[in-house]
């Protein structure tokens, strides 16, 4: 596996893509459940956590409408593409823990899945990747993960993070 990453020096952001290459002479074992991002954050405060999201596009009047998902301890929110339509859900989301947050973007035009959960200890976990990945790589073959961007922000205003780029 190889990771290609960019760390932004003018804002608190990082993006990366993972590459898997079979450099052997036989097929690889099955590659599945690859999470391009699997990050745990533990905010210093135990304030309310809110996931700010956008509806996807299903050709309706509420396309791309913002909405919030409160995350109580033990709560989990799963979302993603439907039937290969990557626009059926927005791949951009902002996890807000009151004193800051992180904006995550999933760059993938196929079937993707995201999960944001709040553990009982107050920590928050963000996961995203290709849904239903189940492949073997032949010698010389390479596949890549979705490109992930994360931008961390401080303060109580969720829109502050949106304007850091």
Segments the model singles out, each with a brief description of its role:
Residues 32-35, 160-165:
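Composition- and surface-driven signal marking solvent-exposed, interaction-prone regions
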Residues 135-154:
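Short Pro-Gly-centered flexible turn/kink motifs
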């Amino acid at each position: 596996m190889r990771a290609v990453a960019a760390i932004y020096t003018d804002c608190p952001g990082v993006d990366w893509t993972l590459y898997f290459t079979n450099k052997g002479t036989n097929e690889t074992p099955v590659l599945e459940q690859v999470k391009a991002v699997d990050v745990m954050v533990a905010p210093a405060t135990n304030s309310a956590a809110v996931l700010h999201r956008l509806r996807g596009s299903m050709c309706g009047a509420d396309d791309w409408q913002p909405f919030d998902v409160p995350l109580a301890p033990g709560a989990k929110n799963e979302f993603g593409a439907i039937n290969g339509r990557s626009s059926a859900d927005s791949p951009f989301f902002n996890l807000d823990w009151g004193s800051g947050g992180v904006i995550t973007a999933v760059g993938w035009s196929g079937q993707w899945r995201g999960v944001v959960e709040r553990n009982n200890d107050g920590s928050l976990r963000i996961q995203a990747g290709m849904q239903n990945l189940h492949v073997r790589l032949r010698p010389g073959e390479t596949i890549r993960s979705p490109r992930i961007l994360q931008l961390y922000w401080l303060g109580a205003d969720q829109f502050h993070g949106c304007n850091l780029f």
